[in-house]
Amino acid sequence: MINRRQLLQGGAATILTASVVGVSSKETPQLEIIDTNLSLFQWPFRRLPLDDTGLLIKKMRALGITQGWAGSLEAILHRDLSSVNRRLVEVCSHHPELTPIGSINPTLPDWQGDLSRCSKKFKMPGIRLHPSYHGYTLSDRFFAQILEQATKAGLFVQVAITMEDLRTQHSRMRVPDVDLTPLPRVMRNHPGARVQILNLRPKAAQIDLLAKIHGVYLDTSRVEGTDGVPALLGKMPAGSVLFGTHAPLLIPEAALIRTHESSILDEKDLCALFVGNAQAFLGA
């Protein structure tokens, strides 16, 4: 069995594939990895090792991550999200590995225009929401309106449940996790919507709730334990779990290590988790 050092020094995608098919990494074509949960720029409350885009790209390449869906950390506190999204697109245009995911704050004027620009001007595949930071809940009319307009525009919607652990949050800005309880009702009213929940630390009751909702997907960034990812795959509908790291707020190696050290996923499972499910989500 390969160890962590081999995994992280040898190119994660190639090493992971070789380990499950039982051949040497030299004989194995590199497995694609799509990271559905990246962010660019600086976190407002502290510097992070990978908050420089060049360093983040270098780390992605070292780990074999071939594509990253990137939101903007500027969206947390900035009010001019049109400019935030424009800067994101400009930076991503210089890095073919990055796919920009626009940010929408429905409590601000002209959020409908921001959503339209994400779709029509910037040709983004999806948008990202931060309800707790922007002051609304999933039961507010804003969320239903976003789902309706995003679905009409062919955009998926990512909902960041949290951005950092409560224990590390600034003492003057404690931000609770998003409450998922209203989600089943809202999704029933928007059957064509595609919603990916980001940064969820799955609990049994939450997974039981989410597994029953058509159109809901999860990422792996905060799944804990060496058996956490296989357990999540076993409880959620097929194709509904996508690989994500939550870099730069979390180190991307962590998500890869947890996936590898489960020693349960076979080649088919890995391919689906790393790339197939994300591709299907894009085309759904």
Question: Where are these predicted regions, by residue range?
Answer:
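Mid-to-C-terminal alpha-helical segments outside catalytic/metal-binding sites
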Residues: 2-36, 45, 49-67, 238-240, ...
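A short acidic, helix-capping loop that chelates divalent metal ions and anchors anionic groups
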Residues: 42-44, 76, 165-170
